[in-house]
Amino acid sequence: MSNIRLFFSDNILENTTSLLSKEHTHYIVNVMRLKRGSNINFFNKEGEWLSEIVFLERDRVEVKFLNKIKESSITSNIELAICLVKKTPMEIILQKATELGVSRITPIISERTEVKELNLERAIKITVEATEQSNQLNPPVINKVTKLKDFISNINQDKKLFFADINSEYRMKPADIKKNQSISILIGPEGDFSSQE
């Protein structure tokens, strides 16, 4: 059985110990039922480390970081700008976008968007869990909810924006994207963009 992977936001140094958060402690003790001496892989944007549980009680777990097993990787320059949808579909979108390696997610409000808020704490939790499960190192950055017109006006000239327009004659070609170019993929609301948008 492979080691479980957990996101660790603090810096990790080899041969140091760390007391884990209540959330990680609960997961290790009550959900995974690991024992002292068990190995866990911790990761962050700097890489992935093998650790060993050196102290374990019901409400306290301490690990020792043994060695770095994976170097940090180059993150993609892909932003998913998506109009907010209902809770369950939005959570699936956050999960799948993370698994596909999107580096940034920007929730958008357009004229026809029915949902106006995103629970940022929940969204971050979903993306961190998806990062743990998909063997990635970097959860995507989740930007604050932004109005469509503000998002469009702040697009950098170096960034390529893609969106579907059923009335357009233009069809995207692979040559439209240069290697390592920043791109944004804009997904409209359930009722499509308004004619003014």
Where on the chain are the PLM-derived regions?
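N-terminal positively charged helical leader segments and presequences
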Residues: 1-71
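RNA substrate-binding interface of SAM-dependent RNA methyltransferases
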Residues: 71-163
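Glycine-rich nucleotide phosphate-binding loop and flanking beta-alpha elements
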Residues: 48, 88, 170-172, 193
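A glycine-rich beta-strand to alpha-helix segment
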Residues: 175-197
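Glycine/charged-rich beta-loop-alpha catalytic/anionic-binding loops adjacent to active sites
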Residues: 18-19, 75-79, 181-183
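Carbohydrate-associated surface elements
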Residues: 167
